[in-house]
Swiss-Prot record:
Belongs to the eukaryotic ribosomal protein eL15 family. GO terms for biological process: cytoplasmic translation. The lineage of its organism: Eukaryota, Viridiplantae, Streptophyta, Embryophyta, Tracheophyta. Disulfide bonds: none annotated. Pfam families: Ribosomal_L15e. InterPro entries: Rbsml_eL15_core_dom_sf (IPR024794), Ribosomal_eL15 (IPR000439), Ribosomal_eL15_CS (IPR020925), Ribosomal_uL23/eL15/eS24_sf (IPR012678). Keywords: Ribonucleoprotein, Ribosomal protein. This is Large ribosomal subunit protein eL15y.
Amino acid sequence: MGAYKYIEELWKKKQSDVMRFLQRVRCWEYRQLPGIVRITHPTRPDKARRLGYKAKQGYVVYRVRVRRGGRKRPVPKGIVYGKPKNQGITQLKFQRSLRSVAEERAGRKLGGLRVLNSYWINQDSTYKYYEVVLVDQAHTVIRNDPRINWICNAVHKHRELRGLTSAGKKYRGLRGRGHLYHKARPSKRATWKRNNTLSLRRYR
């Protein structure tokens, strides 16, 4: 087995004594640092490489901290409108994953880079920590590499804000494949609308 296979097996056993100790120490370190911080190399090199990372010029990795739990509805001065049924503030569940939120925050802060992918690295009772792989689309090495230069096209600007990354496609319900799965297209919202709209055509 190669080295990456051993690393993968280590991360599969997160409850082992070694990993529990390591994760606790790392989590303490992460808490002392800013919410978005650049790191020199990925914490999980096997995972990063599976998601497209290469240890070469133009690729950067940032660690992002996201607060766990539900999303409170922002209501200025507590003023809510409509019927009591729709006036909830605290018990609401955000439809997007925390991983997609981490990608969004990294993408907003680093506007000149393109978000490629992300993965989980740690969590405690308050926060989840993700590492986001970003690509410098202006770098010559990236522009000359046929495997990654697709991301240099202008259509991929802020793909994380439009649900085009892997995490984005997952919360949009577009991850699956195969027979009958095309019924979920073009989106969950469009599918719901199509199935719940009564259409009485003139000639039927």
